[in-house]
Amino acid sequence: NIPPEFKLLESLLLETETGYFLLERHLERLCDSARYFGFPIDAASVRATLEKLAHGVKGGSKARLMLSSDGSVATEIEPLRDTGNPTGPYIAFATTPVDSANPFLYHKTSNREVYRCELEKRPDCTDVIFVNERGEVTEGAVSNVVIRNAGLLLTPPVTSGLLPGTFR
């Protein structure tokens, strides 16, 4: 029983010159989540909707796609915000660990309460980094965690309880 307000989400970077960044990976992740939650999805229709949304957009933008349980798609687009240079702490660790067994951590959905709550606790920060019940770093509320070590880019394993980012 899925409430009607529950949706699957994708947030995509749209650049005037190159189009959607990692579009195929976003569509693949959306289709995987649709299968998991039993949402009907027409990937070709989703692609056409995104292409129509991009038409005439100038400059970098953030596109947001929402898939409902009946298969309908809604979109929004907004210019990229300049976060500037924050004064004070940029990030903090979440006060409560996440449960790596929580299936919602592995899918980008409208069920984002855990992220919202932790961000609200730290209005001085632009992001909050989560750890799981084993103390493993997982992800940020609005970002992926990427560590550069000896020329390699390392990310936490998805099994730690995090969204399978498209840039992994």
Could you say what each language-model-derived stretch is?
Residues 1-62, 66-168:
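Helix-start/capping segments and mature chain N-termini
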